[in-house]
Amino acid sequence: GQPIVVGEGSNVQDGVVLHALETLSEGEPVAKNLVTVGGKKYAVYIGKEVSLAHQSQVHGPAAVGDHTFVGMQALVFKATIGKNVVIEPGAKVIGVNVPEKRYIPAGSVITTQAQADALPEITDSYPFATLNEGVLHVNEAFADAYLHLEEGGESTGGAEKPAAGH
């Protein structure tokens, strides 16, 4: 299915699967296999500055809101995820709408809207409240380091070189 869109500044790590069901049949849209974001229809929509961690899967129809972290081996299927959400590793979110600023604990299976509505809110005390920002930052540093190497520079491992004598 198409279109599949990944927003600006998003991070798609190794082993991620983005897939969708058929979105056209005999030249006509298959509405049940599309999500609407901003008035446009998508098979899979990944917002801006989203992290899709190793081996996570987003299977359409699905939408993942801006600034969201989808953890390692997590699954989003036929679901809409709000902005600023953390889906911890191994969680499965199927057929629901997750409100903004919530987290899904590791290994959870969320298959009813009542479960989705009852998800805990992200607060300052939540240990992964800023996880997505950190993941985006470190991966941006990796990308910059790779570009520097490609241009003939020396690797700094993504970190600044220490001053001489230190």
Give the predicted meaning of each segment.
Residues 2-3, 8, 13-48, 54-56, ...:
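Glycine-rich hexapeptide-repeat left-handed beta-helix
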